[in-house]
Each structure stands twice: as C-alpha cells, then as structure tokens.
C-alpha cells in the first residue's frame, strides 16, 4: 500500500511516495522461485514454473498463395492433464481450468522466443517449419504418351 509522505514543505514538485512496511522480508522471499526469478503474476506456482511450451512458425494457408504470418514465430502452451478440462452438460462446450490455453505469443525471431521461455523457467521444444517443395508442372504433361492401356474416363 502506498502512502503520501511530505519530506519538507517545499513546492509541490518535491513530494514523494514511500511504501509502508506492510510487506515483510519473509513475504518477499516467498514470491521467488528456486532459480531466483520473481513470480509476479499471482498464478499458482505449479502452473507458472512447470509448463511446457511449443515454439513454431505458422504454415502458409492452403487456400491462399501469400505467406501471411509466415515471418513470425509463435509460442503456445501444451494442454494440461489432471482433469483440467470438462464438458458443459447443456451446450456441450469444452471448458478448461488452464488460463493459458487460448494464449499465443508472437516473436520476431526464434531466438527471442527461446530466450523468453528460458527466462520464464518453462521447458520448451521447437518445431522447425517444413520446407515447401515447388514442383514445376507443365500443361503438356497431360498429353505425354504412356506405354500402358488408355485411360477410360467416364463422364456419366
């Protein structure tokens, strides 16, 4: 909790804020994990530190010829087990206790995504994008001679 403390009665610009001594030293050390990193999100420790994340680059959409979102690397979380999913009886919707399930983070480079995951203390694995193979097709290939029997194509 912050309280306003006036040091001297000088002009208004010299007033400062000071924190009260509500937080004890034991509470400050309880907020850090074993590696010395501070957990500030307020989430349970097992959900914050023991997560596995996937780092990948999104594939090109099959219905378009452009490379939309192909330059970004994404980070998302694996699905938790332990009964953290359920189905709504009335509508049949899927529910989850995992608050990070629908969260996807974008990064400019793979290295920055890996560094972020390591700084958060998450285990990670990287899915490298599959290389696209471009095969040149000619219209004349439809009329090449084949040694086998002729194809009979039925239209009706």
Curated annotation (Swiss-Prot):
Q: Does the keyword Zinc-finger apply?
A: no
Provide a GO CC annotation, any one: plasma membrane
Could you confirm whether the keyword Iron-sulfur appears in this record? no
Q: What is its main location?
A: mitochondrion
**Keywords, ordered alphabetically:** Electron transport, Membrane, Mitochondrion, Mitochondrion inner membrane, Respiratory chain, Transit peptide, Transport, Virulence
Q: Name one GO biological process term.
A: electron transport chain
**Gene ablation phenotype (knockout):** Leads to thermosensitivity, as well as to osmotic stress agents sorbitol and KCl.
Annotated membrane topology is: Peripheral membrane protein
Record localization: Mitochondrion inner membrane
User: Where does the record say the transit peptide is?
Assistant: 1-17
> Main role?
Accessory subunit of the mitochondrial membrane respiratory chain NADH dehydrogenase (Complex I), that is believed not to be involved in catalysis. Complex I functions in the transfer of electrons from NADH to the respiratory chain. The immediate electron acceptor for the enzyme is believed to be ubiquinone. Involved in osmotic stress resistance and thermotolerance.
Q: Which family is it part of?
A: Belongs to the complex I NDUFS4 subunit family.
Q: How does it assemble?
A: Component of the mitochondrial membrane respiratory chain NADH dehydrogenase (Complex I).
- Identification of the protein by name: NADH dehydrogenase [ubiquinone] iron-sulfur protein 4, mitochondrial
Q: Which organism is it from?
A: Candida albicans (strain SC5314 / ATCC MYA-2876) (Yeast)
Organism ancestry: Eukaryota, Fungi, Dikarya, Ascomycota, Saccharomycotina
């Amino acid at each position: 909790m912050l309280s306003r403390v006036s040091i001297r009665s000088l002009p208004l610009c010299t007033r400062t804020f000071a924190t009260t001594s509500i937080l004890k030293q034991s509470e400050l050390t309880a907020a850090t994990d074993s590696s010395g990193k501070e957990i500030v999100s307020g989430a349970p420790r097992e959900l914050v530190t023991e997560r596995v994340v996937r780092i990948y680059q999104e594939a090109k959409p099959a219905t378009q010829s452009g490379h939309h979102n192909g330059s970004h690397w994404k980070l998302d979380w694996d699905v938790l087990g332990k009964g953290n999913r359920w189905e709504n009886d009335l509508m049949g919707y899927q529910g989850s206790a995992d608050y990070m399930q629908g969260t996807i983070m974008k990064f400019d480079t793979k290295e920055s995504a890996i560094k972020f995951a390591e700084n958060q203390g998450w285990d990670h694995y990287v899915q490298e994008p599959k290389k696209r193979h471009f095969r040149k097709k000619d219209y004349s290939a439809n009329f090449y001679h084949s040694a086998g029997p002729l194809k009979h194509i039925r239209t009706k």
